[in-house]
Amino acid sequence: MSSPELLLRIAAAQRAVLAQTELLHREFGRAHSQWKADGTRVTAVDLAISAGIFRELGASFPADQFFSEELAHGDAPVPVTARFGWVLDPIDGTNNYAMGLAHCAIALALFEHGRPVYGVIYDLARRKLMHGGPGFGLLDGDQPARVLPGPLHRHSLIGFHSPVDQKHGAQARRILEAFKIRGLGSSTLHLAYVAVGILDGVIDHNVRIWDIAAAVPLVWAGGGEVQFLNGEQFPLRQFDLKMPRIFYVAGNAAVCARLREVLEA
């Protein structure tokens, strides 16, 4: 049975994300952006959404911890100590957002004891809120959703990240030869689209925890798997802007097995 504390936070998370969608749409394709030291883009909207969501949640849950790439205080890792924590990517797909490409999302994850238990993702392109977690089900807008069943076939669509690090070049060639690839420019949406049955699977070697934290519980709720290939990520012990890149596959069990087979060939 879900605790009242958890249910209160789930409802608050949905309200907090939806409260930022008007700003997200209004500034789409015209927000001023800058380049950070790590080579990633940030806009004033990223910062405003981070501040707005955490201000609202912090007022209701002051004992929780709040982690965002855009609002981190210094580069030192921050230990995860609270029962409840939040990991936010205010705009996943900032390059798309700044240039007027609609595949981008607000992605908010609720953690309990270091594990993601609920995700709330607003998909700008489809104007839909995707949300769910294990034991809570999964909604794509107002419709229940599931990971696609069955093995991969010639019409299957696989999400894949680019550019590709040279050390993954041989694997990338095999993936491109074996599957129909979709690269949307949003790691959150790649994984969330697996959860709701738009993509069959995803392979990614170049994400950090804030890129996927909100989508992982959606996949679990939708009956799928997220398999980490370079070490388990949960429970999250610390939030670190310099954490190593995560390498994972996701889909139903048969899809994950096939993707790993191609990677290991």
Show which residues each predicted segment covers:
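Oxyanion/phosphate-interacting regions
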Residues: 1-10, 14-15, 173, 192-265
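N-terminal subdomain of lithium-sensitive/metallo-dependent phosphomonoesterases centered on the IMPase/IPPase/PAP
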Residues: 1-91, 264
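Active-site-adjacent structural elements in enzyme catalytic cores
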Residues: 15, 59, 75-135, 139, ...
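Residue-level signal for inorganic ion chemistry
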Residues: 24, 46, 57, 94, ...
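Acidic beta-strand-loop-alpha-helix segment within the catalytic core
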Residues: 108-192, 238-265
